[in-house]
């Protein structure tokens, strides 16, 4: 057992030295984003702000986006409760994604580049690299949690106490650890770093979508979702530490699973090998657009399906919004006076979120060009009449096309499901949703 992880501590120290700039940006950036907005929320809470926010956050649409609160009466809704409800889930989500990308880049990606083989040629254990990377990720998230807790306490707000502040920070830290552990498992299963990254992010997205449904329909089911353990701690209200225990056990189990999977596979291989290609290539590969579409086809199809599912998940909540509005006289008066329906208001909000996510696909397409060039896969093209400008502009047009199609599919998924959920009471049609997406 010791031989498998021999000299992991040496690798750990070297990795910290290598990544110290990245660690500083990671911890300070996410730490400030998570804990430094307390003064801004104090401004929101002035006057009747807390009561207004409480009524707004009872909307099933908002619960599906940011999570629930245990507070049942508006007068009990404190600044700490509002901050935890609006910030904790998204900060935890960011921590999961960043940790996952870090783990994949230092495990499966380095294995692809031959760096892992080089490291193993020295007197280190076969799995020392993975243990060192996980230990580094664990250290970073612990520092992040401590920074967030200390930062929130420093503002001296009465309803943000020490226990709640460090529970808030600990929840985000455990979220990051879960993301890193999931990435380590997927790095063993998938044959490439691209596959490991895509599957991990897809899994995180699936957990988010599932919790959006269970938070609205049956909150008890959210406790069985690893992402639910982030915000069901309820900092500054119930201060429930039990979900963090579940998260810790989950992380330990999946870490052991990842090491077992790594032990029984060959270096460079995966449990889900890549699909074999055609015996003969299509004629479309003779053109630059055809070649680049082929290179990006898998990523584009995966993300486009995710956009449809994401839109459909949020669209299913529209029926619950109408029920909520019918039983809340204050919210009904507010929307009547504003002249905007609750469906239109939510559509405008959720479209901004979905379009922000859709932008990931064009970025991934453009980044693919850089990755292919770095790996020298395009060297043979450069000796022909094809110019770098052709490759660049082809990629840009493909990225724009992917973004436009992504917005359309997300809007159609949202609109189609929303109209179905609202039945005959809908004030919007599919063209309204498409217009909101492209506006």
Where are the predicted features?
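Long, hydrophobic alpha-helical segments
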Residues: 83-108, 345-369
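Transmembrane helix boundary and interhelical loop/hinge segments in multi-pass membrane proteins
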Residues: 100-122, 363-382
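Secretory targeting signals
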Residues: 135-190, 194, 394-439
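Terminal transmembrane helical anchor/hairpin motif
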Residues: 4-5, 41-77, 196, 202-257, ...
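Alpha-helical transmembrane segments of multi-pass membrane transporters/translocases
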Residues: 22, 26-30, 232-288, 295-311
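Hydrophobic alpha-helical transmembrane segments of multi-pass membrane transport/permease proteins
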Residues: 21-65, 90-96, 199-211, 299-322, ...
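Alpha-helical transmembrane segments and their helix-start/interface "positive-inside/aromatic belt" motifs
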Residues: 9-32, 187-202, 289-307, 390, ...
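Juxtamembrane inter-helical linkers in multi-pass membrane proteins
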Residues: 117, 122, 268-288, 329-333, ...
